[in-house]
Design a protein with these regions (language model features):
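Flexible, membrane-associating and regulatory peripheral segments of lipid-active enzymes
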Residues: 1-124
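Serine-dependent carboxylesterase/thioesterase catalytic core
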Residues: 125-135, 141-244
Length: 244
């Protein structure tokens, strides 16, 4: 068993945000009910605010990406209906992730795989992207476990706003723990977004080439991303993400 990260700074931040958001719903709702509002309408209003906030989060990523989209071949077009369905699924994923999977990462998204599961092949290490934690890849983890990959480990990036180099060093230590825990000689690395950059740096500067049997990057901004543009002053990692 590898060392559990427990609450990361990211998870603690989202837990506090969840408590504050919940307290605001309760306080404002209680005030509205005391003023004579229908409790059912108050609950509906709170739910509408909750879902709308998650919708705005998705739009904040979707719209810049849509404006900077690359030209597509005709065979890659999915049409308006499929695009809308994809957006709705992303919205629902945001409802589950912000705040639940993020805020409750020690319980809902442990670093270690469940004990006693059958496994085939090399152990798998999942590496989430910027400003996320293990909870973000819970669906990937669950899918791999259902598919017979019982040794799936997940790492939360730390520290959140530091450089990709710091995260790659953190990944190097984590991979060594996984190899010691499983007795395997190599791992499979799967990274999402910034997780792919972290894996690339780990492979080339932290001795990961000999320890990775396979490395997969999904949606990683190797050429930079417009979502990070203009936010470089928030931390060195934003500058790296804006340029790739």
């Amino acid at each position: 068993m590898v060392r559990e990260q427990g609450f990361t700074a990211h998870g603690r931040g989202f837990f506090i945000a969840f408590v504050v958001e919940l307290a605001l719903y309760v306080l404002i709702g209680a005030g509205c009910i005391a003023a004579g509002a229908d409790p059912v309408h108050v609950v509906h209003g709170a739910l509408a605010v909750f879902f709308t906030l998650r919708l705005l989060l998705v739009l904040g990523n979707f719209l810049p990406s849509w404006r900077a989209r690359s030209p597509k071949r005709a065979e890659h077009e999915i049409g308006a209906a499929a695009t809308l369905a994809m957006f709705i699924r992303e919205w629902w994923a945001a409802v589950l992730t912000y705040p639940f999977l993020f805020a409750f990462e020690p319980w809902l998204a442990p670093n270690n795989p469940p004990a006693g599961r059958p496994h085939r092949g090399l152990p798998v290490v999942l590496v989430p992207g910027f400003f996320t934690n293990r909870g973000y890849l819970s669906a990937w983890r669950a899918h791999l476990l259902r598919s017979g990959y019982g040794k799936v480990y997940t790492l939360s990036p730390e520290p959140v706003f530091e450089s990709v180099e710091r995260n790659a060093g953190h990944l190097a230590r984590f991979v060594d723990e996984v190899l010691a825990d499983t007795g395997a000689g190599q791992v499979i690395l799967i990274g999402h977004s910034m997780g792919g950059l972290t894996i690339r740096l780990y492979l080339h500067r932290f001795g990961g080439m000999d320890k990775a049997g396979l490395a997969i990057a999904v949606g990683s901004p190797f050429g930079g991303t417009v979502v990070a543009a203009g936010k470089e002053r928030l931390g060195p990692i934003l500058g790296q993400l804006s340029h790739g």
